[in-house]
Amino acid sequence: MDARELSELEHAFVAAQESSAPPLAANFRFPDGFLWGAATSAHQVEGHNVHNDWWAWEQAGRVATPSGAACDHWNRFRSDFDLAQSLGHNAHRFSIEWSRIEPEEGIWDETAIEHYREVLLALRERGIEPVVTLFHYTMPKWMAARGGWEDPKIERYLARYAEHVLGRLGPHVRWWITLNEPVVHVFKGWLLGQWPPGRTRAWATALKVLRLMMRAHVRLYHVIHAFRPDARVGIAQHALALSPDDPRRWSDRWSVKVRGHLFNHLFIEALHTGALRVPGLFWERLPIARTLDFIGVNYYTRDFVRNSGYTLAGLVGDAEAERDHRQQRGKLNDLGWEVYPEGLAQFLREYSRYKIPILITENGIPTQRDDDRWVFLFMHLWQVARAIADGVDCVGYLHWSLIDNFEWADGYKARFGLIEVDFETQERRIRPSAWRYAEIIRRNEL
């Protein structure tokens, strides 16, 4: 990237980084075969996913704005992929909607399966590598009625769904993600009550659900490899940078360690080593080791943690309080999250200890100001480049998101897209930041 094109903020960022670390080589080149692209998820873009638990949650008035038609991506995927191709993307992450494949228990919608086959063929025809998520937060209403993630049989139902999908779609997909952000799902659904099933402070149930999610991942891992031995199978792990609310307070520093382990390492460590542990609290051996071929990293921001006692909930910090964002030191995005690029390199280095490839499966900013999007993107890619230069095996970067979409409880106010969507007309417009990202992709270098 020509230095003359850099904004004042970018220059300041680069200067700050260079002052505290060895300089990054000019015109840093990313590895050959690096995956460049963006990501979406079914419920957030397809529209009218009427058979899942999130649709029921919305219709019950649990969110201010329901998903409705979303981006109508179900009908517009080809033209959306044309835009991705025009931007030079060589990879695209999306999810298959379980409730479309199996809208009623044991009843398979072959039309939906064929639709996703056409999605995969459309990507392949455009030279775009699919990265497919099997479970991105939503489940069929019938599964939710059985107890959802609290039902010990869910791994069996997920495996049956995966077998049906792999039987038809397996030849077209090498990269698979079993679960998206399982720990976030547990926090939002069983501790904060903000997402289905709407439990609050249900710590014992939350730990049970985490175990079931781990077992489900293992079952899915083996199903995928049975159909496609050369598959690359991982999860998308939400990585949340954490700092103590008061660095002088020992209890806050300890809470950062506990919450950091629970949120950022517990799931991956368990799948890699077979040990489910929280230091000083519990340890359990599970038959789940060595079931990650890569680690997907979703990274957005940093939180500040204040200890609120010496129970597990207290050690994690006040997970229900908005104070986590009160003391942010950096620039805030439209959802009040701090822009903290250093955290991405931190996690790339931390996760490299597992000695398996890392794919950045989400990284983006909700903002109406596209200049901020470009600065965010550049600063985070700078951190990726620095980590790779230090020897981290990072194989790709997928920006969140390709298009503006339905952002769960935040509705449509969070504009993450490289491509702007007018939700009244469904018109698309490529943002300037997307073209600047395209130039990095074209050159495969910063």
Each model region followed by its residue ranges:
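Active-site region of glycoside hydrolase catalytic domains
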Residues: D2-G61, Q85, E105, E114-R373, ...
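Active-site-adjacent substrate/metal-binding segments within catalytic domains
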Residues: E46-Y116
